[in-house]
Amino acid sequence: MLTKRIIPCLDVDHGRVKKGINFVQLKDVGDPVAIAKAYQEQGADELVFLDITATNEARGTLVQTVEAVANQVFMPLTVGGGIQSVADMHALLRAGADKVSLNSAAVADPSLLTAGAEKFGRQAIVAAIDTRWQADQNRYQVTVNGGRTSVDLDAITWAKQAVAAGAGELLVTSMDADGTESGFDLRLHQQLTAAVQVPIIASGGAGSTTDFVQLFTQTTVSAGLAASIFHFGELTVPQVKTALKQAKVAVR
């Protein structure tokens, strides 16, 4: 049985880890290298590193910061933000990332996923999808540019297209739940796992061990990602894993 993964997320803005609510109101959390090391000591399964302002400010991801983090941690590292080309992917993988995450650029040009998968293998290519529930259309809508821009695209449809293009994994964030600590969007992740056959990392809304238990008992996602609860010490990775083990969910 495949074990479920618990993944802290480092949202990095100008070299500092930040965390906001619904993608705004950013608070400073600290130095990414120190925080990454702390998560490694806690037994996190992987780490996601997102340069949250890279795409919006049209600059490359902070390769030096990625290198510094990769030198200190030995768990798989996924890096995203500002990736516009295969050359950008190569630079990050060379800097120590195990996987690269594409969001806005892939929506604009899905062939980037294909090119990356052909060069580095599907397992290294993650499509990140930020989505909001659109009640009047009865669907999840894709957003880009760090959640600032809505796109006329159904998130479930885009998930299928991204996988067909070459994504070996999806990192899906509920913008409605992000930072609220009110629980994962179970409906979203149920729809996604029914639609695609690749591993899905669920993001947005984690607030308690119960939220992780519900995520893994009510959906078939592969991983749960969180930032706020871990950064501010409300929960530790071992506490989450203990609760999951008690609920008979397989974890490392």
Swiss-Prot record:
Keywords: Amino-acid biosynthesis, Cytoplasm, Histidine biosynthesis, Lyase. Its EC number is 4.3.2.10. It is an enzyme of class 4 (lyase). Pathway: Amino-acid biosynthesis; L-histidine biosynthesis; L-histidine from 5-phospho-alpha-D-ribose 1-diphosphate: step 5/9. It catalyses: 5-[(5-phospho-1-deoxy-D-ribulos-1-ylimino)methylamino]-1-(5-phospho-beta-D-ribosyl)imidazole-4-carboxamide + L-glutamine = D-erythro-1-(imidazol-4-yl)glycerol 3-phosphate + 5-amino-1-(5-phospho-beta-D-ribosyl)imidazole-4-carboxamide + L-glutamate + H(+). It is found in: Cytoplasm. Gene3D superfamilies: Aldolase class I. Pfam families: His_biosynth (PF00977). The keyword Nucleotide-binding does not apply. GO terms for cellular component: cytoplasm. GO terms for molecular function: imidazoleglycerol-phosphate synthase activity; lyase activity. Belongs to the HisA/HisF family. This is Imidazole glycerol phosphate synthase subunit HisF. It comes from Lacticaseibacillus casei (strain BL23) (Lactobacillus casei).
